[in-house]
């Protein structure tokens, strides 16, 4: 089965073609970072308009690169949520229109299920069951995964997601957008131990997260330095390192708890923040000590992309699931409500 996947949940337009027998045939992505950088964050209306502009050229590019034509497409998968409603509607409308015109089924995919299954595109994919850490700009969740659609939420952020905290913290100390890569870049130049930030909600039982207070702690630390006349680039680097270390160690502590609680040995990390090298290194060390294994997608499939949507959609289509012709999206959509495959 050849499935065309469309991703338009936020600020990246992703298109990919996945073959259930041959694997990924082609993928293309356009990032709107430059469009939104001047505003310091994503502007939903601009994101929607740019998706409209980019979608068809990217589809043509993927078809050309794969050597396929519309007649070779067996189905279309699209991100139906969660995400920005206008952006989601662009992808859903395009998918349903093409499905009608080409006479093929369409299926709406849960954005975070796409992220969760992205490591399945690698040469050594994880096997069920496992614990998944979904960590992105909009979500920070720990999930027990027993199969596709068989999800048990173990813990989640009660306020800011980790990726959101990275972006907001970067803005507070005068860094550019997107903030996550900027924080990581400066952290490499930071002085270890100059600042020590708290590890939120690690001194109590449970698997929930909270990063809002850490963001405030960072702001207060930066303001004290500025008032003391020390707003140097090195101070920014030292604060970036302290912040990143606090986030990473908080995630590590919670992941260790989740693995012990479930008795599982394998961990999947997915979402944009999973590209962070400090987090990857920490998890690899921790899982080595626990005689387990950590799995993640290649860096370009950690952020939003069409490949993960094409793959996730293909699994549901092969199980006989597909949508009717109505155009429907879900900006808020609990992943544990998905049907099992």
Swiss-Prot record:
Its main location: cytoplasm. It is found in: Cytoplasm. Its cofactor is Fe(2+). Signal peptide: none annotated. Keywords: Acyltransferase, Cytoplasm, Iron, Metal-binding, Transferase, tRNA processing. Its EC number is 2.3.1.234. Substrate binds at residues 134-138, 167, 180, 276. Fe cation binds at residues 111, 115, 304. It holds the Pfam family TsaD. Binds 1 Fe(2+) ion per subunit. It comes from the Bacteria. This is tRNA N6-adenosine threonylcarbamoyltransferase. It comes from Pseudomonas aeruginosa (strain LESB58). The gene is tsaD.
